[in-house]
């Protein structure tokens, strides 16, 4: 057998074999369609629905996250405004309290000065009265001594005793 004979025999198509292959292929397609195509198609549909649901869920979650972020931003802004207001109120109260304390201290100082001036004036008046009394007593004592020179010894003794007695009282 030559190469040409082998080559010619290999190109020869057998109609019976081709028909048999065609029937087997058709049966195989029917079996695949009946047993595998439905489950594969169902699996692909489920996968498609899952992808769609996941995309919808992701979009919904993104919107929720944006809403939550906006709410938190608004709450943070509100908190900052409240903090600023609280600080402003605290400063105003501190200034008011400081002014009240200074005014009260000034009033207390004025009252203390007034009381000190009154006490000083009273002490001065008492000192002057005491000095007058002492000057009067000294003058009287001097006058008595001058008069005592003209008195007898017994009159002088009585006068001294009387003077000492008056000092004790």
UniProtKB/Swiss-Prot annotation:
A GO term from the CC aspect: proton-transporting ATP synthase complex
The record's Pfam families line, in alphabetical order, gives:
ATP-synt_B
Q: Which residues cross the membrane?
A: 12-32
Keywords (alphabetical) are: ATP synthesis, Cell membrane, CF(0), Hydrogen ion transport, Ion transport, Membrane, Transmembrane, Transmembrane helix, Transport
The cellular location(s) given in this protein's UniProt record come to:
Cell membrane
Q: What does this protein do?
A: F(1)F(0) ATP synthase produces ATP from ADP in the presence of a proton or sodium gradient. F-type ATPases consist of two structural domains, F(1) containing the extramembraneous catalytic core and F(0) containing the membrane proton channel, linked together by a central stalk and a peripheral stalk. During catalysis, ATP synthesis in the catalytic domain of F(1) is coupled via a rotary mechanism of the central stalk subunits to proton translocation.
Protein family: Belongs to the ATPase B chain family.
What name is this protein filed under?
A: ATP synthase subunit b
Provide the species name: Lactobacillus helveticus (strain DPC 4571)
């Amino acid at each position: 057998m030559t190469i040409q004979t082998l080559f010619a025999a290999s190109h020869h198509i057998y109609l019976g074999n081709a028909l048999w292959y065609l029937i087997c292929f058709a049966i195989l397609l029917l079996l695949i369609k009946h047993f595998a195509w439905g489950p594969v198609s169902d699996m692909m549909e489920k996968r498609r629905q899952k992808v769609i649901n996941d995309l919808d869920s992701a979009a919904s979650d993104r919107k929720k996250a944006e809403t939550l972020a906006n709410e938190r931003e608004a709450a943070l802004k509100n908190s900052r405004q409240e903090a600023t207001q609280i600080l402003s109120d605290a400063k105003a109260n501190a200034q008011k309290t400081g002014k009240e304390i200074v005014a009260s201290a000034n009033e207390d100082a004025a009252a203390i000065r007034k009381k000190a001036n009154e006490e000083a004036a009273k002490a001065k008046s008492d000192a002057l009265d005491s000095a007058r009394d002492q000057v009067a007593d000294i003058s009287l004592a001097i006058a008595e001594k001058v008069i005592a020179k003209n008195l007898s010894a017994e009159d002088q003794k009585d006068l001294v005793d009387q003077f000492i007695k008056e000092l004790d009282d």
